[in-house]
Amino acid sequence: IDPPYNLAKDFNGLSFSAISSEKYAIYLRTWFHKVCDKLKPTGSLYMWGDWKCTAALQTVIEERLTVINRITWQREKGRGAKANWKNGMEDIWFAVNNPDDYYFDVESVKVKRRVLAPYKVDGKPKDWEATSDGKYRLTYPSNFWDDISIPFWSMPENTDHPTQKPEKL
């Protein structure tokens, strides 16, 4: 779920004003609990937010679901700030209906990392792949994603949207 961020922005001829964190949480509750009603008992969801709205997201998510993890997605697009740190990340909350029974296919999201030598189990390489491009190991993914680029201005999928996500996500 990628809800509107609590930003003061003009986009496509519409103006949006930032509101207090408390009012933003009230807004989230107007629709989020209905989304949760649609989840299967083993269901899970991912919900995006920036640094300014993520506290409200966590609060509202935890009213109905169990947060399993918070993923930090490093994004390079954004404007610098002369009196502050440029925001180069977003949070992605991973939450489930039932923490004892939910679907997560780790095999489909393993990450290919370059390594010098394989890990071995009973003398045989584990999750090891030697190719003409190098030697790799399939490893479990972390909750820090730095390998998915935001669409830059020269990319066909780029839009003017202030919080655009890449198709790869």
Annotate the PLM regions.
Residues 1-169:
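Core catalytic lobe of class I
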